[in-house]
C-alpha cells in the first residue's frame, strides 16, 4: 500500500504541521475508498520496481532517472513493460533508465514558457494544484524548491508519480497527495502555488481563486495557467455542452476578465507573462498514450476552432501576489 508516513514526518516540524490535525484521516478515507478497483493492481506493479539507485538524475533540464547503462537489455525490457501498465501517460516526458516515456503532453514546453517569469524557487515550499503525474513537481525540485507538494485525486496519476519517485533512488522532498483543493484547509503556508490547467474545470472559478489564495502565505506568489479567449474584461466563454470534446469545461475568460477576477480576490502585482495557442505538436497521440488527442478535438477543416466551433485552445499564464484579504470575500 502506498504510504504517506514520510510526508507526515517531514512536515511535523514545519509551517505545515497543523495540517496533520486532519490530513491522515482524509488520506486514510481515500485509501479505504480505493481498496477495490485499479489501485491494488497498480500497487502490485509498484512493488515490482526493484532496481538499483540510478547512476544519474536530472531534474534541472528534464526529468531523467538513470542513463540505461546499469540495466541489461532484459532488465530494461522488463522495466518498460511494467511502466506501460500505467498507461495512458499524459504529462511528461520522462526518461527512465534509457526508456523514453513519450507522453501525450510536452509538459516541458509549458515549463519553458512559465519558469522564466516566476520568482526563484530556491528554498521555497511549493504547492502544485492539479499536478497530474508530477512532471512539473520534479522540475520545481530541480529549480531549487525546498519542498514540493502536489495534489491530484487521480489514483493513476499517484501511481505514475510513485513509480518515478521509487526509481529515482532517493527520498526526495516531493510528495503527491490524492486530494482535491476543496479538501485542503486554509494553510497560509506556501511560498508559491501553481494552478496550471485547472481553472476551466472548476464550476466556480472565483471559489478556486480564493482556495488558491488560502494556501499562500502573505506575499506568496500564484502562478495561474489556464485557457483563455480574446476579448475585454467582460468576455467569458461558457460552452453550451462540450469544449474540445471535454464535458467538464465551465468558464473560459479573457485575460482581462481573469485579471479582474484576481484583483477582486485581493491579489496584487497581477501580470500576464505569456499567451500561447496550443500546437498540435504539444498535445498529441503517442505510443504511451494511444487515445484521441488534440487533433481529434479540433475542426478537421479549420484548426483555429474546436470540433464544436469554439476558438481553439489558447493558454495564458498569469502571475499574482497574495495581498491582505478583503473580509467580504472570506
Curated annotation (Swiss-Prot):
Listed EC numbers: 2.5.1.-
Enzyme class: transferase
Gene3D superfamilies xrefs: Vaccinia Virus protein VP39
Entry keyword annotation includes Zinc: no
GO terms classed as biological process: tRNA wobble uridine modification
Pfam families for the chain: Methyltransf_9
UniProt catalytic activity: carboxy-S-adenosyl-L-methionine + 5-hydroxyuridine(34) in tRNA = 5-carboxymethoxyuridine(34) in tRNA + S-adenosyl-L-homocysteine + H(+)
InterPro entries in alphabetical order: CmoB, Mo5U34_MeTrfas-like, SAM-dependent_MTases_sf
Family designation: Belongs to the class I-like SAM-binding methyltransferase superfamily. CmoB family.
Function: Catalyzes carboxymethyl transfer from carboxy-S-adenosyl-L-methionine (Cx-SAM) to 5-hydroxyuridine (ho5U) to form 5-carboxymethoxyuridine (cmo5U) at position 34 in tRNAs.
Assembly mode: Homotetramer.
Name of the protein in question: tRNA U34 carboxymethyltransferase
Gene transcribed to yield this protein: cmoB
